[in-house]
From Swiss-Prot:
Belongs to the transglutaminase-like superfamily. PNGase family. The gene is PNG1. Changing residue 257 to A: Abolishes enzyme activity. It comes from Saccharomyces cerevisiae (strain ATCC 204508 / S288c) (Baker's yeast). The lineage of its organism: Eukaryota, Fungi, Dikarya, Ascomycota, Saccharomycotina. Keywords: Cytoplasm, Hydrolase, Metal-binding, Nucleus, Zinc. Inhibited by Z-VAD-fmk, a well-known caspase inhibitor. Also inhibited by Man9GlcNAc2-iodoacetoamide. Both molecules inhibit enzyme activity through covalent binding of the carbohydrate to the single Cys-191 residue. This is Peptide-N(4)-(N-acetyl-beta-glucosaminyl)asparagine amidase.
Amino acid sequence: MGEVYEKNNIDFDSIAKMLLIKYKDFILSKFKKAAPVENIRFQNLVHTNQFAQGVLGQSQHLCTVYDNPSWHSIVLETLDLDLIYKNVDKEFAKDGHAEGENIYTDYLVKELLRYFKQDFFKWCNKPDCNHCGQNTSENMTPLGSQGPNGEESKFNCGTVEIYKCNRCGNITRFPRYNDPIKLLETRKGRCGEWCNLFTLILKSFGLDVRYVWNREDHVWCEYFSNFLNRWVHVDSCEQSFDQPYIYSINWNKKMSYCIAFGKDGVVDVSKRYILQNELPRDQIKEEDLKFLCQFITKRLRYSLNDDEIYQLACRDEQEQIELIRGKTQETKSESVSAASKSSNRGRESGSADWKAQRGEDGK
């Protein structure tokens, strides 16, 4: 009997280690240099599909632009760090957490949302008159838009809105700047400016951040929470943390595509945010969009070492499971319940007319 036991005494630990090594090799092989057939498919796709061209173009900017150490230094010198960390420490201690817990970063992001919206940045439906001064925006009549002048062009300004003051008759320009460092100075804008600067702010604190673009003209952020071990929705316009349901449920917004852009990858995260009111997804075949995101992601990770690639791939797999399921049934029902009970249906930021035009007023 003892001899039989010896033969059947399988070393499961060794087998598990061997399988893990093989699995890791398999994962790494998926992120090695693209095969020629993949390159051909990618080139054909971006040459024949306008949506694919747009995703590629955005990735070339959004995946890298915020990783700028000199910008990070300027941001940290500009913000009131003493106030921010004082408030974080206060809330952290009040909830009974101990120093060193990795949930601290979640508290930091929540405070940055509060600080950015309530103390630092200003929503701008219409600008104040340059001649009459503060609190005069209601006197402004829009006259249309024009291109930037030489000075405005220095700060990546795409268009300039022109307004006339009904009181004094003077013209005021509202440049729509895309340079986040310039936005540190102007401290005003709409959702594009808010998300642009807030993404840089999160990056400046060393956080893993993604910029999320929605085809129906809204943008927001995600940051990877080490405590929750997943990507978390963050919207600075709404001071919203981990509320991915607010767009389709609270705002009643109709959406088709939501794409996340980060330094390590591009991901279609539509299923996280589009819980109802889904518009037709007819801009690109689903298998082509999946391939496109994976191809761009592979490019972004090409210079990483094997351990980094493997860790990110495991994180990807976990996220895909979450997206395929939508959310766990419990979490989803909690989200819908919380949204339906909210007394603040519809978007917070923006004028009533502007929100109604965009279909974001909850009606």
